[in-house]
Regions:
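Short Fe-S-cluster ligation motifs
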Residues: 1-13
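C-terminal catalytic domain of Rieske-type non-heme iron oxygenases
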Residues: 17-234
Length: 234
């Protein structure tokens, strides 16, 4: 099935089990829809999504923007598998950020809500205290186009309640963040994502752990690192 939505063309090459996820903010006329480009990355599609879901790297990779020392701790948050829509959600996510958005006048504790709408598509809802209330939160979308099991094209889309920043400033803000992530992703070995045993999670990884368990429940194998007890790596 082929479908046009949210400025992209979507393709389902298998049996379609559910309709394309809803993104209601995209249809709000006063909100600003900001396509931020597509980026080739040598990594697994699943690694790309999991990096997007991680807050712990903010102070170290996005220093002075999404985080900064000494505010490095990830506060406990809630994670749930919403079975009625088959999505993973994380709520009550808070992180102190020096520059939460181009329009942010000062550092703030930012509230995040993460939504994994499908294995290769994730959405971040980010409360912008400088916003005017046109939409409940700014929206940052990561749509992964797999080119192979270890090579992706990452598409970024923002839907913002920002009536003051220029389009260029908004795009450059998101591009800077992603280009900081890219070398981390490309040097993260193995490139494919191990779903269990090989990597040890911490409390900050509750969302990533839920994502991996969700993939296991789906018997997902594309882009997954296969590790056997005999030490064979596929």
């Amino acid at each position: 099935a082929v479908q046009a939505a949210y400025g992209f063309v979507w393709l389902c090459i298998g049996t379609e089990k559910k309709p394309l996820f809803q993104l209601q903010e995209y249809d709000v006329a006063a909100a600003r829809r900001v396509p931020c480009g597509a980026y080739g990355v040598r990594t697994s599609p699943l690694r790309g999504i999991e990096n997007f879901l991680d807050m712990a790297h903010f102070p170290y990779v996005h220093t002075g923007i999404l985080g900064a020392e000494p505010e490095t701790a990830v506060k406990p948050y809630q994670v749930e598998w919403r079975e009625e829509v088959d999505e993973i959600w994380a709520t009550e996510c808070f992180f102190t950020q020096p520059l939460a958005a181009p329009s942010s006048p000062q550092p703030q504790e930012t509230e995040y809500v993460y939504r994994v709408a499908s294995p290769l598509n994730a959405i971040l809802y980010k409360v912008n205290t400088a916003a005017e209330g046109i939409i409940p939160a700014d929206v940052v979308c990561l749509f992964i186009q797999p080119l192979s099991e270890t090579h992706i094209r990452a598409h970024l889309l923002m839907i913002l309640d920002d009536q003051t920043s220029s389009m260029t400033d908004m795009v450059l803000f998101q591009q800077k963040i992603f280009t900081q992530d890219k070398p981390i992703l490309e040097n993260h070995l193995p490139l494919k994502l191990p779903l269990e045993k090989l990597e040890i999670p911490t409390k900050a990884d509750a969302l990533a752990t839920a994502y991996r368990k969700w993939l296991i429940a789906k018997n997902w194998s594309y882009g997954v690192h296969q590790n056997t007890h005999r030490g064979h790596v596929a």
